[in-house]
Amino acid sequence: MTHDNKLQVEAIKCGTVIDHIPAHVGFKLLTLFKLTETDRRVTIGLNLPSNAQGSKDLIKIEDVFLSEEQVNQLAIYAPRATVNCIENYSVVRKMVPSLPERIDSVLTCPNSNCISRSEPVCSSFSVRARAGEVLLKCKYCEKEFAHHAVMEQ
């Protein structure tokens, strides 16, 4: 009797694979970026073994391709992620997210007094990195937050 210890996640024929997501961040990305708002199959692997990270999350979305803007927005929470475009079971394009200047309509401002929480406006944050930390500044209340504070909303 053979015993195979390798984890196997089914390959997709066509679509997007987001790999090297920090462990415990995959579900948050699915929610924030509305990656489940499709009628296509979405596969998520949580706490998978990773030589580089110890453990990682992985998301596969069949027949859906992310825009460059969407890929770059992932950099706020998964800066070392790779986004692979798959066609006929082969990687045809590999993208690495880079920090965008702005992120709109995705996040919620943590400031409970911000008008973006009570008025029908789309959230909007400017993004910058300082000393290895990602900071987000709300367009409306002009308060600046560490990305963890915004992620918890």
Curated annotation (Swiss-Prot):
GO terms for molecular function: metal ion binding. Zn(2+) binds at residues 109, 114, 138, 141. NCBIfam families: ATCase_reg. Keywords: Metal-binding, Pyrimidine biosynthesis, Zinc. The keyword tRNA processing does not apply. It comes from the Bacteria. Binds 1 zinc ion per subunit. Belongs to the PyrI family. InterPro entries: Asp_carbamoyltransf_reg_N, Asp_carbamoylTrfase_reg, Asp_carbamoyltrfase_reg_C, Asp_carbatrfase_reg_C_sf, Asp_carbatrfase_reg_N_sf. The keyword Metal-binding applies. This is Aspartate carbamoyltransferase regulatory chain. It holds the Pfam family PyrI_C. Its cofactor is Zn(2+). One of its GO terms (biological process) is pyrimidine nucleotide biosynthetic process. GO terms for cellular component: aspartate carbamoyltransferase complex. Involved in allosteric regulation of aspartate carbamoyltransferase. Contains catalytic and regulatory chains.
